[in-house]
Amino acid sequence: RGSGKVTFGNRPNGFYYARIVNQIPFEKILRGNPHRSFAVNFRCKPFFYHGDVNQLTITESIASFTNPGTVYSLPKLTVTGSGEVTLMLNGKIIDLDFTGISGSIVMDSELEECLHSDQNASAAMSGEFFRIPPGENAFAWTGSVTSVVIDPNWRSL
């Protein structure tokens, strides 16, 4: 039994998160004949994640982008900056305080974690983690930001 990403032949351009729910008969597989057949049963989470999605790198304080999915995505944002920073996505606000932090802060909306160098940086963040709705989205920031890299995790039902 295991879990991970699974891609099906009828939807080769992405994947589901799934886990195997039945026993795989490895002892039968390993006995001589290399051509064995057996069933593998998966329990999949409901979202189809779009494959081959490029990260969005934003270097200007105002930008827009489109979520091609049919449901909101839970992005991972890597913000490089200094001082006090405000991020805005469609009017929703996250404040970041880089005091004592050099480099980047990573905000993972799926895990609801805010990290700096793999260490908890929750105290540096104020606001709710972003969800990117389907369609056109407006993004902006104020403060001293070098870049925002968004791993969008586009998905559909």
Feature map (PLM): residue ranges:
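Short beta-strand and beta-hairpin "edge-sheet" elements
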Residues: 2-46
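Intrinsically disordered, low-complexity segments enriched in serine, threonine, and glycine
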Residues: 48-157
